[in-house]
């Protein structure tokens, strides 16, 4: 109760179906608050639904969706805000989360796509690192050698994209010498449909995210 009475920023980290009952429990306090910011980490729970419970335009509402690399300060955090939230409040949240990774403010309607790309993305990358590791072991590297090489390759390659600002296709082309090993591997990956499979995986994650939102709304 004291938290809802005195805090300027409250992070709410419960299940989506638990948030509205929680807000209803403290509605008497929330009715009297101004300059309060509630930050929800519940997937799929729309800001409008929380606003309908609180019924106080002076309470700012923010949705965030972090991914697991926030645990080592290298995460992606998607953020959407209600109209009552000021730029100063967003800056405050950014400051509080600065040690967790990069924060990207987006429209609320894009939260589910962002979840599919960034929230689910680490699992897809782990699969690719694992596959490259297994390939290296099959070619004679020790598992430790192959794993370290594959993981470092992903890290360095990602940093190249971020620091150069170049399109990934241009950076890929720079690695592919005519008639060389790399272009042979790239062509084979195109033949087996790697690009399409990754796109399909992200789309499947997005579809399931929307299904979970609908399931939570029924609870």
List where the protein language model places each region.
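Aromatic-residue-lined binding/catalytic grooves and analogous aromatic/hydrophobic interfacial grooves
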Residues: 121
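Rossmann-like NAD(P)(H) cofactor-binding subdomain of soluble oxidoreductases
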Residues: 1-79, 83
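Internal alpha-helical scaffold of NAD(P)-dependent oxidoreductase catalytic cores
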Residues: 49-60, 76-113, 125-163, 208
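Hydrophobic alpha-helical segments typical of transmembrane helices
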Residues: 18, 46-49, 92, 124, ...
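NAD(P)-dependent Rossmann-like dehydrogenase/reductase catalytic/cofactor-binding core
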Residues: 151-219
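Small-residue helix-packing motif on alpha-helices
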Residues: 3, 19, 50, 142-149, ...
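Glycine-rich beta-alpha junction loops
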Residues: 43-45, 66-70, 118, 152-154, ...
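Short pre-catalytic strand/loop immediately N-terminal to key active-site residues, enriched for Gly-Thr
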Residues: 62, 111-116, 168-173
């Amino acid at each position: 109760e004291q938290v809802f009475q005195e805090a300027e920023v409250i992070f709410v980290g419960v299940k989506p179906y638990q948030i509205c009952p929680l807000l209803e429990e403290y509605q008497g306090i929330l009715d009297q608050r101004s300059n309060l910011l509630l930050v929800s980490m519940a997937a799929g729970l729309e800001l409008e639904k929380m606003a309908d419970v609180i019924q106080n335009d002076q309470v700012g509402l923010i949705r965030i969706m972090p991914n697991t690399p926030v645990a080592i300060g290298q995460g992606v955090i998607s953020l959407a805000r209600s109209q009552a939230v000021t730029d100063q409040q967003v800056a405050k949240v950014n400051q509080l989360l600065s040690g967790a990774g990069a924060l990207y403010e987006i429209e609320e309607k894009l939260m589910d796509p962002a979840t599919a790309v960034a929230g689910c993305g680490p699992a897809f990358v782990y699969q690719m690192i694992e596959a490259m590791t297994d390939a290296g072991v099959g070619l004679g590297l020790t598992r430790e050698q192959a794993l370290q090489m594959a993981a470092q390759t992903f890290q360095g390659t990602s940093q190249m994209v971020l620091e150069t600002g170049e399109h990934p296709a241009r950076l890929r082309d720079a690695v592919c010498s005519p008639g060389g090993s790399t272009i042979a591997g790239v062509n084979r990956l195109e033949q087996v449909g790697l690009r399409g499979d990754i796109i399909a995986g992200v789309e499947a994650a997005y579809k399931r995210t929307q299904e979970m939102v609908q399931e939570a709304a029924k609870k």
